Design a protein with these regions (language model features):
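Membrane-proximal soluble regions of multi-pass membrane proteins
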Residues: 307-358
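Glycine-rich, charge-dense phosphate/pyrophosphate-binding loop(s)
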Residues: 361
Length: 381
């Protein structure tokens, strides 16, 4: 237990100490996004999931190192390394999505703000103000007042298309398939009926499950601290359930994510100083799914994922085109972009809630579902 605690503290500290530096680095690198639900629409560093990834990796690798010492606990290092591989692959896909720039939009924006051309030739010693993206940022932020209000643009970064993202996610399942993670059969509670999936499980169900979980975590976002907070609740519950059932590897994966997320929430909760980006939501989805599969906790995982499943069907109604974030009103509440409810956030927007209240409400609901699931699956079933 001391080994596990030491690894979790390491993951927390790595994320907590690296995030302030990441904020400056990401902004200087042009990896930022507009916080649309604030009055002044500030530009904040995005892709904060990278610091969570570093904390997650540090936690698990420290745990593996400490358990490898003679006299340490016996764990399946192969399973942990496979889970790490899957999480890293998906996190990189999220990072690619975060940094993908619409070059046509950039050129259009450039042409609309002046006739001066930007020199893209870089030298060994270059002042940050001379970098192309920084010149563009300076122009958009008011140093050159021509053109449209910079706060009216949503972002020049439009991300990868849905099809490429889906295809890129699938290879992340290969490490888990290679080590035979998960169970090829499932017993339904109450009726005690067992379904034997056979080869369908590793070749079909496992990749599709990873694809679904990573994407639905990405769907239920839009307010400061929402994606990180809900993932924190889910991963903590998974860790507890895995530990109680003797699935130590699953608990290590889940709690390592929890430790890193707890540190990140200090910076991402309302009002955020850094945004998570797809690198975080994809990372959380992959880590949570890996914990489910490694610990054979799919039934419990489906239960605590109830809000995400509801979000999926709500977004399906809109053809996956609806926005979860809202429009800031004069009184500080948020109003939906849509007349119908296409997201769980829209339910609370209709109740005239602020961004902070929406985030806290959804995290509270997820925590209650997790507690109910722990009682249901450990005591009753």
């Amino acid at each position: 237990m001391i080994t596990l605690a030491a690894s979790l503290v390491t993951g927390f500290l790595v994320t907590f100490l690296s995030t302030p530096y990441a904020e400056k680095y990401l902004m200087a690198s042009g990896i930022f996004a507009v916080d649309q639900q604030k009055k002044d629409k500030p530009r904040l560093a995005s892709s904060g999931g990278m610091t969570v990834l570093f904390g997650f990796l540090s936690s698990i690798t420290v745990y593996m190192a400490l358990t490898s010492i003679p006299g340490g606990s016996t764990v399946n290092l192969t399973i942990l390394l496979a889970a790490l591989s899957s999480v890293i692959i998906i996190s990189l896909i999220g990072l690619l999505d975060d940094i993908h720039v619409d070059l046509e939009a950039v050129m259009t924006e450039h042409l609309s703000i002046g006739d001066d051309e930007i020199d893209i030739e870089l030298h060994r010693q270059t002042n940050i103000e001379s970098l192309p993206h920084q010149k563009l940022l300076n122009r958009l932020s008011g140093n050159f007042s021509q053109g449209k209000d910079p706060n009216e643009d949503e972002m020049l970064r439009n991300g990868l298309g849905q099809i490429p993202k889906m295809l890129f996610v699938l290879p992340a399942a290969l490490p888990l398939i290679a080590v035979g993670a998960g169970s090829w059969s499932m017993t339904l509670p109450i009726i005690d009926f067992t379904i034997n999936w056979g080869i369908i499980y590793p070749l079909v169900l496992l990749p599709l499950g990873l694809l679904f979980v990573s994407n639905v975590v990405n769907m239920l976002a839009g307010t400061n601290g929402l994606s990180g907070g809900m993932s924190l609740m889910a991963s903590t519950a998974l860790g507890i359930f895995g530990y109680l059932n003797g699935q130590i590897e699953a608990a290590v994966i889940a709690w390592s994510l929890s430790a890193a997320l707890a540190a990140f929430m200090y910076f991402n909760f309302y009002p955020a100083s850094i945004l998570p980006g797809d690198s975080l939501t994809y990372l959380c989805g992959a880590a949570i799914f890996s914990s489910m599969v490694v610990g054979n906790m799919e039934k419990f995982g489906v239960f605590i994922f109830t809000p995400y499943i509801l979000e999926f069907f709500l977004k399906l109604r809109s053809g996956f085109s609806a926005r979860s974030w809202g429009i800031l009103q004069q009184d500080g509440t948020l109003d939906s972009h849509h007349d119908k409810i296409y997201s769980l956030t829209h339910v609370f927007m209709r109740r005239n809630m602020t961004e902070r209240q929406i985030t806290v409400s959804l995290i509270t609901i997820e925590s209650l579902i997790c507690v109910t699931g722990l009682i249901l699956f450990t005591v009753i079933l």
